[in-house]
Amino acid sequence: MGVDQVCEFNNEILNKPGNKEKCINTLQKLSGNTHFQNCGMAIAFNDSIIWTSYDVAKLTMNELSLKDIENYISKDAPYMCCGSYKYELNGKYLFSDVEGSIYTIQGLDIDSLLIYLRQNKFI
């Protein structure tokens, strides 16, 4: 099974920041704006892809001051996260509007995966 997530803002892919400076820059871009978290999954068996799934969540971030951003980063240290936030921790409080699955936002659309596994009697 393979899973990956891509954060997209204004037709730009926002990579995992890796450090505080890039994290601040990303959050400043997203502040007050709408972006998308895209989650893709695939299952392969015997050298064949037997299932794929793709889901998108739409998120609108609150307006954040530099102090807000620095306070948030000090709590969650989201340096290895698409979009520079950990939605499952304090990141969820950064948003004014969210459309889509929290699992897609977190990078694993578990709902779609479980439906597939149940329908095919893997679980």
Language-model segments: residues:
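Anionic-ligand binding patches
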Residues: 1-123
